[in-house]
Design a protein with these regions (language model features):
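Flexible helical/loop "lid" subdomain adjacent to adenine-nucleotide binding pockets
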Residues: 43, 153-156, 160-182, 190, ...
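ATP-dependent adenylation/nucleotidyltransferase module used to activate substrates
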Residues: 2-153, 157, 161-164, 169, ...
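Nucleotide-activated sugar donor-binding and catalytic core shared by glycosyltransferases
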Residues: 185
């Protein structure tokens, strides 16, 4: 029976494959380079949609505990709702993973209606729910699963849409909410996460949003793919340029 349960619940943990070691090395480097885990941090909240990115983040952070880092508590926060980014994921699936890891799971309900759907306002609503839930358990550090490719998209999207040269920042102090956002996957490319998730059996399609499939971010991703036909390293270069030269205006919103 235990073997059957283990097969049904994908858990990624050391000892790692070569790819797992590479991802852990990248996340450690990001933590050290950007001071993501401040001294004395006791609790971290992970925004957990249940997709490959947030689960990879959860597994890697959980594996770091006690291995060069304190045994900090991890609280997973899942926003559920008809059109939320985690809508395609079974609640039982997420609960089972968190139970196996010994991670506290908090589920928040989004009340977004189809006629109200718009990516920016939806994102703000989900973040508000995550931040409030994090503070309720005493976690003032909130980790998001944004990776290198997300940062490249954000840079180009901001440049084209707002004439701003700004990518995702590794660390953002949200003064309005009294929490700090961290992005430990900032150095990791999406393809590596996809391979990691496939190896451990949690690569699942999750987005159920009827708006998201036609969003500006999707359009920017198509532009980047077209650029890659002529400039193979453009994705990594965009993300790197964002870290080196991007605006820090969003660092303390």
């Amino acid at each position: 029976m235990a073997q059957l349960t283990e097969l049904l619940i994908p858990i990624a943990k050391p000892p790692w494959t070569a790819l797992g070691r590479e991802l852990e090395s990248c996340i450690r480097k990001a933590i050290y380079d950007f001071g993501l885990l401040e001294e004395g941090v006791e609790r971290i909240a992970v925004a957990l949609s249940g997709g490959k990115d947030s689960l990879t983040l959860l597994f890697l952070l959980h594996a770091l505990r006690g291995r060069g880092f304190p045994l900090f508590e991890i609280h997973a926060i899942h926003v559920d709702g008809e059109f939320s980014c985690g809508a395609g994921i079974s609640g039982g699936f997420i609960r089972s993973i968190c139970r196996e890891l010994g991670v506290n799971l908090i589920t928040c309900q989004s009340t977004q209606k189809r006629e109200q759907l718009e990516c920016y306002s939806c994102s703000r609503e989900r973040r508000r729910l995550v931040f409030n839930a994090a503070k309720e358990v005493g976690a003032t550090t909130v980790a998001f699963g944004h990776h290198r490719d997300d940062s490249a998209q954000t840079l180009l999207l901001n440049l084209l849409h707002k004439a701003e040269f700004a990518a995702n920042l590794p660390k953002v102090h949200m003064r309005e909410y009294g929490v700090t956002i961290i992005r430990p996957l900032i150095y990791i490319e999406e393809e590596s996460i996809r391979s990691f998730a496939k190896h451990y059996g949690f690569a699942r399609i999750t987005c159920q949003c009827p708006v998201g499939q036609n969003s500006k971010r999707k359009a920017v991703e198509q532009i980047i793919r077209q650029m890659e036909e002529h400039f193979p390293y453009v994705r990594g270069n965009l993300a790197k340029a964002g870290l080196l030269y991007g605006s820090n205006k969003a660092a303390t919103p």
